[in-house]
Amino acid sequence: MYDSDEADAWKRAVDLGIEREHRAQPVVLDPVGAFECKLTFFFRRPKSHYGKGGHVKASAPVCHVSKPDADNLAKLVLDRITRGGRIWRDDSQVAKLHVEKYWAITDARIGVYVSVQRFEGSEA
């Protein structure tokens, strides 16, 4: 993701979310363990996705397939989690990563939903 006003807004939102979640459910830093992380991004739909009455058109896409790229979004979030220093020492500890991008159904859903858990993977 480019260092733009939009990227800065995402960074602030991620930082606030990390702080809020940590207050609600404190986590102990694990400096060596492996983690699994799922990131689900929801973006505001453009006006062209809406028809009469403000309803989403049946032809409007579900998946967000334009910029920013999924890998850049993931890097931003993982770097912010690392910067927060509350879960892992370094985002290289993320052994499994799943990223999804969608258009939000409502503006209330816009943002990123993050799920992190310890990864007890097996050899492939």
What are these regions (language model features)?
Residues 1-124:
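Acidic, proline/glycine-enriched N-terminal capping motif
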